[in-house]
């Protein structure tokens, strides 16, 4: 493109554009890019950071409400109702549970499929 991607404007159109907000901003932006682009961008990043910090703090406060410190009475109640733990007893108890839940059963085969019985 000969105009570098810009559209051609007549003199009247260019004067009207220069008087518009976009034209004045573009002129100021070309003179001082940091003041008119960089500074607002950095400001938005800082303000966004503070805004998002407030939103995420609500999440952390809600999670902290779920976790509460226990008093002595609650600790004693937990210790009193607890049964003794023996690793061997738990092992044998879990071994017995596994035997009750299943029974051997052959999977039905499709017609013409071998039974793989040797």
From Swiss-Prot:
Nucleus is among the record's keywords: no
Top-level lineage group: Eukaryota
Biological process, per Gene Ontology: mitochondrial cytochrome c oxidase assembly
Function noted in UniProt: Required for the assembly of the mitochondrial respiratory chain complex IV (CIV), also known as cytochrome c oxidase. May participate in merging the COX1 and COX2 assembly lines.
Membrane topology: Single-pass membrane protein
Transit peptide, residues from-to: 1-28
Location in or out of the cell: Mitochondrion inner membrane
Major subcellular location class: mitochondrion
InterPro entries for this protein: Cyt_c_Oxase_assmbl_COX16
This protein's name: Cytochrome c oxidase assembly protein COX16, mitochondrial
Sequence intervals crossing the membrane: 35-55
GO cellular component, as recorded: mitochondrial inner membrane
Keywords: Membrane, Mitochondrion, Mitochondrion inner membrane, Transit peptide, Transmembrane, Transmembrane helix
A Pfam family annotated for this UniProt entry: COX16
């Amino acid at each position: 493109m000969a105009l570098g991607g810009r559209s051609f404007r007549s003199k009247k159109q260019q004067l009207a554009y220069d008087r518009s907000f976009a034209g004045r901003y573009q002129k100021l932006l070309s003179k001082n890019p940091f003041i008119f682009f960089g500074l607002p961008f950095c400001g938005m990043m800082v303000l966004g950071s503070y805004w998002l910090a407030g939103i995420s703090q609500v999440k952390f406060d809600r999670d902290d409400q779920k976790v509460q410190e226990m008093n002595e009475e609650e600790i004693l109640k937990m210790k009193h109702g607890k049964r003794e733990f023996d690793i061997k007893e738990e092992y044998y108890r879990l071994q017995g549970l596994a035997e009750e839940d299943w029974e051997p059963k052959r999977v039905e085969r499709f017609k013409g499929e071998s039974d793989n019985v040797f």
